[in-house]
Amino acid sequence: MSVFLGYIIFLAAFFGLATGLFLGLKAIKLI
């Protein structure tokens, strides 16, 4: 259960980081 919870947190953090990086690159291209 603890490992499963840690995996979900890791996945959410990784997805959030990837999304932020993608949006940042799109913003740079627009400028």
From Swiss-Prot:
A GO cellular-component term linked to this record: chloroplast thylakoid membrane
Locations listed in the record: Plastid, Chloroplast thylakoid membrane
Keywords: Chloroplast, Electron transport, Membrane, Photosynthesis, Plastid, Thylakoid, Transmembrane, Transmembrane helix, Transport
Record has Chloroplast as a keyword: yes
GO biological process, one term: photosynthesis
Top-level lineage group: Eukaryota
Membrane topology: Single-pass membrane protein
Transmembrane segments annotated in the record for this chain: 3-23
Molecular-function GO terms, alphabetical: electron transporter, transferring electrons within cytochrome b6/f complex of photosystem II activity
Function, as annotated: Component of the cytochrome b6-f complex, which mediates electron transfer between photosystem II (PSII) and photosystem I (PSI), cyclic electron flow around PSI, and state transitions. PetL is important for photoautotrophic growth as well as for electron transfer efficiency and stability of the cytochrome b6-f complex.
Protein name according to UniProt: Cytochrome b6-f complex subunit 6
Lineage: Eukaryota, Rhodophyta, Bangiophyceae, Bangiales, Bangiaceae
Gene: petL
